[in-house]
Amino acid sequence: MGNSPSYNPPAGISPSDWLNLLQSAQRLNPRPSPSDFTDLKNYIHWFHKTQKKPWTFTSGGPTSCPPGRFGRVPLVLATLNEVLSNEGGAPGASAPEEQPPPYDPPAILPIISEGNRNRHRAWALRELQDIKKEIENKAPGSQVWIQTLRLAILQADPTPADLEQLCQYIASPVDQTAHMTSLTAAIAAAEAANTLQGFNPKTGTLTQQSAQPNAGDLRSQYQNLWLQAGKNLPTRPSAPWSTIVQGPAESSVEFVNRLQISLADNLPDGVPKEPIIDSLSYANANRECQQILQGRGPVAAVGQKLQACAQWAPKNKQPALLVHTPGPKMPGPRQPAPKRPPPGPCYRCLKEGHWARDCPTKATGPPPGPCPICKDPSHWKRDCPTLKSKNKLIEGGLSAPQTITPITDSLSEAELECLLSIPLARSRPSVAVYLSGPWLQPSQNQALMLVDTGAENTVLPQNWLVRDYPRIPAAVLGAGGVSRNRYNWLQGPLTLALKPEGPFITIPKILVDTSDKWQILGRDVPSRLQASISIPEEVRPPVVGVLDTPPSHIGLEHLPPPPEVPQFPLNLERLQALQDLVHRSLEAGYISPWDGPGNNPVFPVRKPNGAWRFVHDLRATNALTKPIPALSPGPPDLTAIPTHPPHIICLDLKDAFFQIPVEDRFRFYLSFTLPSPGGLQPHRRFAWRVLPQGFINSPALFERALQEPLRQVSAAFSQSLLVSYMDDILYASPTEEQRSQCYQALAARLRDLGFQVASEKTSQTPSPVPFLGQMVHEQIVTYQSLPTLQISSPISLHQLQAVLGDLQWVSRGTPTTRRPLQLLYSSLKRHHDPRAIIQLSPEQLQGIAELRQALSHNARSRYNEQEPLLAYVHLTRAGSTLVLFQKGAQFPLAYFQTPLTDNQASPWGLLLLLGCQYLQTQALSSYAKPILKYYHNLPKTSLDNWIQSSEDPRVQELLQLWPQISSQGIQPPGPWKTLITRAEVFLTPQFSPDPIPAALCLFSDGATGRGAYCLWKDHLLDFQAVPAPESAQKGELAGLLAGLAAAPPEPVNIWVDSKYLYSLLRTLVLGAWLQPDPVPSYALLYKSLLRHPAIVVGHVRSHSSASHPIASLNNYVDQLLPLETPEQWHKLTHCNSRALSRWPNPRISAWDPRSPATLCETCQKLNPTGGGKMRTIQRGWAPNHIWQADITHYKYKQFTYALHVFVDTYSGATHASAKRGLTTQTTIEGLLEAIVHLGRPKKLNTDQGANYTSKTFVRFCQQFGVSLSHHVPYNPTSSGLDERTNGLLKLLLSKYHLDEPHLPMTQALSRALWTHNQINLLPILKTRWELHHSPPLAVISEGGETPKGSDKLFLYLLPGQNNRRWLGPLPALVEASGGALLATDPPVWVPWRLLKAFKCLKNDGPEDAHNRSSDG
């Protein structure tokens, strides 16, 4: 409400005086702010506290406010004093509003000028709520009511449309009608008297002109008229009916009867009372009834409210009916219905035997005026003889809103009998009428009209009338508001009858619907006929077996907006079936009529037996629901029922879900619409009163409701075993007597809770007991039905899926391997259309025959508590078959079929481990007992090779189970032997963990689009490059396959540099199954490996320049896959321009501005724009003399890697490893990897990090003979080399991941180290790797002969001198790992870091500007 505070007065002032002060504050200039209203409230508190009395105008004048303390409050008091002085003095003392006469109403300050007008703004919902809250306890039309609205209007300057919206929000329908009538009359009178300033009749009505943006004073005049119309509202606090409220124990019927009596006695003639009853039946109802009526709304018809509150009423009360059910017609004159006795004591004298209207204590004074019906001043309206005679005819029927002259005097008894009752069906409230008149179409003399007792006038569609019928526009107030352009008044009478033979009545005023949507028979027709409407009483039987308390938590407590999913159309057959199903649910009390929001579609589904099943599609509601976790993970395994308690009985609960009631606040989400055939009648809406099937939380809520009674009965019979799942319950008892007692106690307990036990489904031993689709025998468990598998080729995809679903259900008792099932599963691939036709192969048909034979032996033994659990793992190429059994049992406990792993190759040892773990989980969950022994069909040599040679970390898990694992050779007794009808062949090449001397060596490598291999045995036998598709990994696989095809069938040592290919080869040679439909290249690789009697698989680090033969041959294979251009070389490695200078053709200068290193976009984006100064650090005098170590971090995708970097201070050779964790163990692992590739250092210099200073790391360095020292971190004079190396490596990684976002971290780091160590050239035109592996310094004696010089020239700096000018060039006499011996006099050894190769004088320049790449 803008800057206005709450209209509720603070302590110490009456409401009228507070409103006077607020209105005076509106005249302040500038306009009042929130601080002004706060000062005004503080002033009232101060006055009440200091003066010890309430504030009034006489006691709180302008002088009562201390100056300067309460802001502009003195100006407000002065304004109030000025206005009241001009109006003739101060008002009198205010009296409370609720006090009745003879007290005078409180004096209110007259409407004053509002000063400067506020800018117009539309109402916000929060403002409308605040206004309604302020006036909800004030009488409509009262002075305080008007004053409150006046202050709200001053704040927003509303247009006529805004005022109409305000009226609809704060007023009841009857008040809205009265206000609109009074406002229309006031506007017409003002326009006729020409008292409106600025009004021009030629430009439109006052409503139209005041809605313009520049209306100004004209809008103020409209607002004043709107407020003046509010003073004439019919309801006043003094009206007797406004003070009638429903008692806490009073039924809704008695409360409505009291309202009707009060309105009949006191309401003026001509004022409709139905809207007042509709409004007050909700507003003055008690809290419990208001909660029931919240979904229907406060302005719903009173009949709907009484039906909704019928259950709340006491049981000895009769439900209220505004209509009566006609009885059988009797000959002779019609007798009035007997007077019904009162249902309870009179609320006036609290005595029984008479109605409240006949109470002797009721005041019987003379009436204040003549009777409005017969104009007789001697009696009240309720005692009018005319009304009593009319009531005798109507007998409790529909009351007319206006006085109508009786027409029964001219009718015979037979005609009167026809008029007295209009029978209507509850589901179809329509009646046939016969019309005649000059304005009707000739074909519209008979029609079907909808009876609506809420409509005051009859409504006809416009297409029933001729085109030029006389009309007058009409404004109609309906449920959606005021409609001004849709309806017209028909200016001419029409004749109407309910039977062809009459009698006919004349209707003078009829509404015409121009949209041709409605044909309604209003209250005017039954009133003129003096007839009643008879509707058969709705039969609502109680819900049999509903729990006392509904669940308070069903997952919808957050009360989201209910879904509005439209009902889709149905054909006539399904619609009739749906109507029958809804009718049955309605009779059973599971559903009830619904008028609130929300909708989910419904449809029927035909069962196999021809019956129909009701389906409610609650997917939209389930999407809004928070799932409640179920108490049971799934159906129990019936083999877990031990054989010891032999006496079993099972029972089933009938319509179990329908016994759980649902609170009314959740019924919005469980509603649906029943469509009418052809849409000729209004649809009907219903909502569930109980938990429906299809609701996501219905199973969990039902389990929670049944959990406690089952626990109580189970505790009382502790020797019996209870098994339950949803509405199926089974009891196993040691004796027959205890079984009978347990059943009686459980059935009685369930009936007390309201559940129905289906006696026809109760069964017990000695006959087999059906339970959860299975049959429980004395020793075994079978399935009630087995699939027949009458399958022929071709077959549709839908039929094959159904067959596989049936097989999955009975698979735990079917003695078969995974192979025939896998054949059927493979036929489902690449088919998505359910109508697709599948051709089965002969092998698949043979698998179906095997399954059909296995189904004939489908059975499982029950668990014997005295015997241990044993397990068998049967490995096949299609998957694993797992068997859980006990010794001496006829059948196993269960069969389990598991597929291969998701990888291309599934190792046999891993499959055995996964099978054992799965069986252990099933044994513990079903029988709460671990497995004693595992048996398998895997060859012992293959299992030993996998355990000894596999690098899989899960080998440790299999070693923990090793004492319990036994091979198949022991042949233990058990039903699993039926599986060994065909022994599985385990083919694997002989694996050798160590290289085979004098054997053939195969090296392979790959690049994008090609692969290569070479064969070597004492000398190079064969080498070749072959084309390959797509990636480098597939290229290396193609090279390996070509090499294996070219190699003779003899032992071979295979060396690859791909980690993936290395892992795949080791998996295959150690024993593994490929996928049932393997990649052709993998299948060919497996067959090629089987050609060789012995195989060794080795991994060589890619791009290694080590001097051993393996690295040399691997480099030879790399040379078979050269890159064609220097641009491709730089795109792969992002090397510096010096490295490109080694490219043979074309030659590229290191300082060429057109070099690929200079033109590369990635390098231009990521290269630093400048470099820091080189600092002096402690360097080694030889390779592996002093190392520096550091840990840096690099983020790739969602992981942050710790890079453990080790740098040789002499050569700059670097090794780095990426680790996920940052522990001392990972640091030691990184150091070991660096020692493997670079050698062992003598000294290691690190920072003072926790990983390097830990006792474990220090002890490790001592054991390896490495001297450990520390430096200050991030210090350029002590840690500059490793910090610079960290930056170079991370720069290269960033470039690679910018070009290839999905490049694995290991490959990116390997490429970065290769580029940094072996490709990028230092200023001396040597790589770091060459410098690290160059020969040591030659020993030259002092008196020896000076070596001869070479052709190489070098520029040099002398060590220890401050002059940074390059000297030379001079030839190098000797080149060694530490430096070069220059031909000075005498010769001087100069380290490589102070040397620079000299090529041409004209090229000597600032080379750093041209070498900004990954190695500055």
Swiss-Prot record:
Residues 586-776 form the Reverse transcriptase domain. Residues 996-1126 form the RNase H type-1 domain. It catalyses: DNA(n) + a 2'-deoxyribonucleoside 5'-triphosphate = DNA(n+1) + diphosphate; Endonucleolytic cleavage to 5'-phosphomonoester. It comes from Bovine leukemia virus (isolate Japanese BLV-1) (BLV). Residues 1179-1343 form the Integrase catalytic domain. The RT polymerase active site binds 2 magnesium ions. A lipid is attached at residue 2 (N-myristoyl glycine). Mg(2+) 2 binds at residues 1005, 1036, 1057, 1118. The gene is pol. Coiled coil: none annotated. GO terms for molecular function: aspartic-type endopeptidase activity; DNA binding; DNA-directed DNA polymerase activity; RNA stem-loop binding; RNA-directed DNA polymerase activity; RNA-DNA hybrid ribonuclease activity; structural constituent of virion; zinc ion binding. This is Gag-Pro-Pol polyprotein. Keywords: Capsid protein, DNA integration, DNA recombination, DNA-binding, Endonuclease, Host-virus interaction, Hydrolase, Lipoprotein, Magnesium, Metal-binding, Multifunctional enzyme, Myristate, Nuclease, Nucleotidyltransferase, Phosphoprotein, Repeat, RNA-directed DNA polymerase, Transferase, Viral budding, Viral budding via the host ESCRT complexes, Viral genome integration, Viral matrix protein, Viral nucleoprotein, Viral release from host cell, Virion, Virus entry into host cell, Zinc, Zinc-finger. Mg(2+) 3 binds at residues 1190, 1247. Signal peptide: none annotated. Its cofactor is Mg(2+). GO terms for biological process: DNA integration; DNA recombination; establishment of integrated proviral latency; proteolysis; symbiont entry into host cell; viral budding via host ESCRT complex; viral genome integration into host DNA; viral translational frameshifting. Its EC number is 3.4.23.-, 2.7.7.49, 2.7.7.7, 3.1.26.4. It comes from the Viruses. Gag polyprotein: Late-budding domains (L domains) are short sequence motifs essential for viral particle release. They can occur individually or in close proximity within structural proteins. They interacts with sorting cellular proteins of the multivesicular body (MVB) pathway. Most of these proteins are class E vacuolar protein sorting factors belonging to ESCRT-I, ESCRT-II or ESCRT-III complexes. Matrix protein p15 contains one L domain: a PPXY motif which binds to the WW domains of the ubiquitin ligase NEDD4. Mg(2+) 1 binds at residues 652, 727-728. Gene3D superfamilies: 1.10.1200.30, 3.30.70.270, Acid Proteases (2.40.70.10), HIV Type 1 Reverse Transcriptase, subunit A, domain 1 (3.10.10.10), Human Immunodeficiency Virus Type 1 Capsid Protein (1.10.375.10), Ribonuclease H-like superfamily/Ribonuclease H (3.30.420.10), Zinc finger, CCHC-type (4.10.60.10). A zinc finger (CCHC-type) spans 345-362, 370-387. It holds the Pfam family Gag_p24.
